[in-house]
Amino acid sequence: MKRILIIGNYIFGRKYMEHSKRLGYEVILAATTAEEELSITEKSNIDYYIQIDYFREEYSLAKITEFYRKIPFDGVLAGHVFLPSLVNLVSKRLNLPFFGTEAIKNTTSKEKTREIMKEMEMFEANYFKFSSKDE
């Protein structure tokens, strides 16, 4: 059975947990919340839990790596927009698929994302950039 690690139980993370379970994955949640404080819904959508600290990346990486040695997983997702760098670190160190730092830099800015999508002819809508409050 495939396993997925989701770092962060914010709105994206909760959605990823639900979808992953529906797709038949075993779900591992890594979050700062104490396990006993997880909601009933969160608990029903996970198979394993790792308590980490989002702002202490090396500490979190060590906890996740220790878990991975016992129970390997196939991929990692970020459960919030501020977590891709931690996901990238974990994925790189554990030799798992990842988006890469350049992709993270380009997709955490809506403006950069829109420009790239427009270049790739994936973005049909017009959007406007303002350079001052007067515009």
Task: List each language-model region with its residue ranges.
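ATP-binding N-terminal substructure of ATP-dependent carboxylate-amine bond-forming enzymes
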Residues: 1-103, 134
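Active-site nucleotide/adenylate-binding loops and adjacent lid/helix of ATP-dependent enzymes
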Residues: 106-135
